[in-house]
Design a protein with these regions (language model features):
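Extended alpha-helical targeting/anchoring segments
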Residues: 1-260
Length: 260
């Protein structure tokens, strides 16, 4: 782990009603890197609370400092220690940022913390097996990123050096961004789905949740069912199709070495 923090260079462009998915597709999804991130708020904006869907954030591959990719996947039991060291590094280092705007993300780390991180602070029974390849914790510092201000219709580009910033701007002006007609994987054919959770197990979980609520142990729970199927579509194509069929008030897409 390196202690060096590099500055960012920012550039402001008109957004022109482009979506997070359009900017992400133009700048980062075609990148040869195995890592890219999209945190997207949709149009139209929430008229009553426009700040709730004001920003989208997208980013590409990790920064490389002193030959080391700025990416972390600590094991369970080490997550909080690694986070504390990273935060201490950031707080103890003053960096002269180049025209850093007031935005929800001005450089730092993108990724996730899985529910299993709770095992670092509580002693809980492990009742379920996790057969997915994704690490319980993953985050990285991107080499470049974009922040979309849907409210002010401003696109902020950020990169580690000015030449990369110019390359991002050139991509924006050269490539077609419209994804509105990309419905190639939406069809009337319904693929067969294999449910990982049985109906009986799901109904039993619902009844158990009701008991917890009645006892005052919890006031809310979110139950889910995992299923799988076979498709030739990429994870990004599936994301676009789902956003078209049923837009979410907030959505995310991660391209990682372990899957999408």
């Amino acid at each position: 782990m390196t202690n060096q923090l590099k500055p960012w260079h920012f550039k402001q462009l008109p957004l022109q009603k482009r979506t997070g998915g359009e900017i992400f597709s133009c700048l980062f999804i075609s990148d040869s890197s195995k890592i890219a991130t999209l945190l997207e708020s949709p149009y139209p904006n929430n008229l009553n609370n426009p700040q709730l869907t004001r920003y989208s954030i997208c980013a590409g591959s990790p920064r490389v400092i002193d030959g080391v990719e700025q990416m972390w996947t600590p094991q369970l039991g080490e997550v909080q220690d690694v986070l504390n060291r990273l935060l201490a590094r950031k707080l103890n280092k003053t960096t002269d940022f180049n025209s850093s705007p007031y935005l929800p993300f001005t450089g730092g780390w993108l990724g996730w913390l899985g529910y299993d991180v709770a095992w670092e602070t509580e002693t809980l029974p492990k009742l379920k097996t996790d057969n997915l390849p994704f690490p319980v914790a993953f985050w990285y510092e991107p080499e470049c990123f974009a922040v979309l201000d849907h409210w002010e219709q401003v696109l902020w580009l950020a990169a580690s050096n000015k030449s990369e910033l110019d390359e991002l701007e050139e991509k924006i002006y050269q490539q077609k961004l419209d994804l509105s007609d990309d419905t190639s994987i939406i069809s009337d054919a319904i693929p067969s789905l294999k449910l990982i959770t049985s109906q009986a197990d799901y109904e039993a979980a619902v009844l158990q949740a009701k008991k917890y609520i009645q006892a005052g142990d919890i006031f809310q729970t979110n139950l889910s069912i995992r299923f799988e199927t076979q498709t030739d579509a990429s994870g990004w194509e599936i994301y676009l199709a789902l956003q078209k069929i049923n837009p979410s008030p907030f959505a995310s897409y991660f391209k990682t070495p372990w899957g999408e």
